[in-house]
Amino acid sequence: MQAADGKKYLTDVANTEQLFRLIQSVPSPKAEPFKLWIAQVAKERLDQMQDPELSIEQAMADYKRLGYSDNWINQRLKSIEIRKDLTDEWKKRGLEEGLHFATLTDIIYKSWSDMTSKEYKRFKGLRKENLRDNMTNKELVLNMLAELSTKEISEASEPDTFSEHINVAQQGGEVARSPIRAGSQNREKRYLTAQRPKDN
């Protein structure tokens, strides 16, 4: 691996999972606090699998800890529910996660915001961060409207081919585009902003 001085050195690297496994295998008492923490996190995850409401409570606590407002957190949780309803509809129609979902999501974004998810992330100065976690309340509402509309149009029209799904996604995004078009050009710029919810 190339170091800051430009020279290459043999370097041990690990991903997160490998690092946790390595910590578990260390016999030193100094590793014990990490092992206990890993066990605690695993227990919490198992509890959440038994009682999904705990996952929601954990998500709320995590967003709060990251500095999001209660109002934004409520909007975000609602957007997660609407997104899941849409992806459930796509699965029911035989679409697969991955390329299908990503393509249709890009079409929805492009139809209401004039940006694909990649362009939207660039607009907000994001790299690996989740785009929806960095949308303002207005942007979340518009995206929820687009995704909810897409789901309802899909249920009504029962698309069979992927090209039909593309058409449905465009129609759903257009529904959310209407409030933006109804306003002036200045209002449109206020709907879409490089600002992030934690910037307020």
Annotate each language-model stretch with its function.
Residues 1:
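Short, basic alpha-helical nucleic acid-contact segments in DNA-binding proteins
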Residues 4, 8, 14-18, 24-200:
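Positively charged, phosphate-engaging catalytic surfaces used for nucleic-acid and nucleotide handling
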